[in-house]
Amino acid sequence: MADRMGWFLRMLSYLVMVPGIVCPPAWGAAGAKKIILDTDPGTDDAMALMLALNSPELDVRAITVVPGNVTAGQGLENALRMVSLANRCDIPVAGGAEHPLFQKLITAEFWHGKNGLGNIELPKSKCKADARFGPDLIIALVRAYPHEITLVPVGPLTNIALAIEKDPGIVPLVKEVILMGGSIKGGNVNAAAEANIYNDPEAAQMVFQAGWPLTMVGLDVGDKTLFGRKQLEQLGKTHGPVNDFMYGVTKFLVELSEKFGDSGTPMYDPLAVGVAIDAELVTAPAMHVDVETRGEFTRGETVANRRNEIERNVLHHFPEGDRYVIEGLDKVVPNAKVSIDVKADKFLELFVSRLQGK
Ligand code: BDR
Ligand code: CA
């Protein structure tokens, strides 16, 4: 019996890997990385999701929705319509938090269109939402697959923070976290902060300090990956429901970028998925990152210590008055790999070819 079962599983994994024979969407290719995409869909979130679903290196185990670019309700609707378009009702899609931990929600229809998907109306979803609360689903999957799940958050970090607050025991069981957020070269919301971090700084600080392997794919590297007219034209040459939807979304974004004098749209969220596919796409040295939660001008900034040490100042009493004296350097332990450079052309080619089904 055991032999028969082994034969059956070997045949199954073979068939799954041969294109066009049998590829039940519910099963990832053998050895594919299990990911949970936590997203606020969102135009570039849509690109991230479709890249993940079209990449055999990844096995999307769940999609959890967080408010950010759009409200929680609109985000869930968008996620459901997208998985339906991709014929992937097998993937659980769960709503999560309704608002950031300690502040009011800020939504970004200004950038993402009134429905969050570049005003492209997808058909109603055939898929139903998973009844579980997003953070609970994250906990359940991490516990079901210890050391196998990679979390890919591409929105505010509220759901991830709620998951670790509820069950801190999942932290050592997560394989890694690859998040889109932050910047070490200024923000997009204001001079200091990037949107995903700004929209829930306390949650972000919890996620950065949790103590798990974490890669930050920030604004500054995303800004080096511009999807422009050349890529749009390539994507327009092939067709299919997902291909055409992606063409519409990227056209909306390219036109938007041109209105602001840019030559293309930054691939923020899809790049985080790209790094999950191939970590070599970015150069990411280890640093210690803290999230500023109080600064008057800097709330939501990711403050990265690039030297991984700080000066040790000790208070001394002198006849002329008290002062601090630098006595040495203290090591700071890195808590993140921070992306500082990216193979942009390679990534853009990967994105277009995957969306074309290659
Ligand atoms: C991030 O903010 C959102 O608008 C995008 O989806 C991306 O996740 C970029 O700052
Ligand atoms: Ca996003």
Locations of regions flagged by a protein language model:
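Surface-exposed loop and adjacent secondary-structure segments within mature catalytic domains
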Residues: 94-124
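A residue-level signal for conserved active-site and pocket-lining positions in enzyme catalytic cores
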Residues: 93, 207, 273
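A glycine-rich helix N-cap at a beta->alpha junction
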Residues: 82, 86-94
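Conformational coupling and interaction surfaces
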Residues: 31-32, 50-51, 59-60, 198, ...
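N-terminal secretory signal peptides that target proteins for export/translocation
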Residues: 1-7
